[in-house]
Amino acid sequence: MGLTRRLRPEVPMHLLTCVPAVCALGICRGLREAGDADACVRWPSDVILGDGSLICLGSHAGYEEGMYVDLALSLEGEGADPDLLERAVGWALGSCDQWEARLRAAGTVAGPLAPVLEDYFDALEGSNQEVDVVYPNGRVAASGVLAGVDVWGRVTVRCDDGREMDLAPEMGRVRPRA
């Protein structure tokens, strides 16, 4: 089951890249406030519920009568509550509105996640814990501790061999170490 919503945040185009992450953070916050203390964001922008269900966020940005981001939400998992997606959309839109207001109030920011960076990192699955870095082909590239995220949404893993590895979403994913 899924839903799609068009968002038109009034922010500079280069800041739109993090809209899915900002929306995932809002959904995670909403779930936690609703009693799901184990909800977390799977980097970069999916949300894991405490029961193991997953809210997947996808996006497509474009320009048609102004800039937009189409945000697609889908719910995966047995026993998933279909009404949850509607509530998730509300949480996502509210988070995007708050983010937009904070960007506007700040004037100039280092990057799109700057206003929510600490909250986003704290919500990430595996933050400050041992993780594997997995390439798109499924090969484990490195193991270490998920040490940070930057204002553009790239994660930093402090590898077991002492080096630091920065990872953009298109380069792979991180998962808790088995």
PLM-predicted stretches and their roles:
Residues 8-39, 49-178:
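Long, positively charged amphipathic alpha-helical accessory segments at protein N-termini or as interdomain linkers
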